[in-house]
């Protein structure tokens, strides 16, 4: 299977077959169907968090940016490296979903470092 992108190529045959099986019959909507409830239960079990709220997203960009939106209020800033995935691959989706902004910080090897973050937070 090829997972470089969730929206640039065809799905593997096994995925398409599973979609066809899931498409049989009728099911409740908005996450109340048996398949979604089963997935939620399995994720809660996997993470040993039986009370965890689980939300499924159609793409990696949606999952990443919605998660950031839960953490980042509109007046806040997302600190990241200039080569971070959210900077390089998510385009303006983080700003769109959070209403905030990204601030690129350069550390050693373009990795976000505690020193770079401290300087940004202190305005130095």
List the model feature ranges, each with a label.
Residues 1-2:
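Extreme N-terminal starter segment of soluble prokaryotic enzymes
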Residues 7-11:
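Short polar catalytic/cofactor-binding loops
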Residues 12-59, 82-89, 93:
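Conserved N-terminal alpha-helix of the aminotransferase class I/II PLP-enzyme fold
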Residues 51-72, 101, 105-110:
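Conserved core of the PLP fold type I
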Residues 69, 85, 91-93, 98-101:
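Domain-start "cap" segments at the beginnings of catalytic or binding domains
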Residues 70-88:
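Conserved PLP-anchoring active-site segment centered on the Schiff-base-forming lysine
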Residues 98-124:
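PLP-dependent aminotransferase-class I/II
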């Amino acid at each position: 299977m090829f997972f470089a992108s969730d929206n640039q190529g065809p799905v593997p045959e096994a995925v398409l077959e599973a979609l066809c099986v899931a498409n049989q019959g009728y099911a409740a909507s908005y996450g109340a169907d048996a398949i979604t409830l089963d997935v939620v239960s399995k994720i809660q079990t996997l993470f040993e968090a039986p009370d965890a709220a689980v939300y499924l997203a159609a793409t990696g960009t949606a999952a990443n940016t919605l998660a950031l939106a839960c953490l980042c209020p509109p007046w806040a800033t997302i600190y990241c490296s200039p080569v971070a995935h959210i900077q390089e691959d998510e385009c303006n989706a983080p700003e769109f979903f959070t209403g905030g902004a990204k601030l690129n910080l350069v550390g050693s090897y373009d990795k976000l470092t505690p020193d770079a973050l401290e300087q940004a937070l202190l305005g130095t």
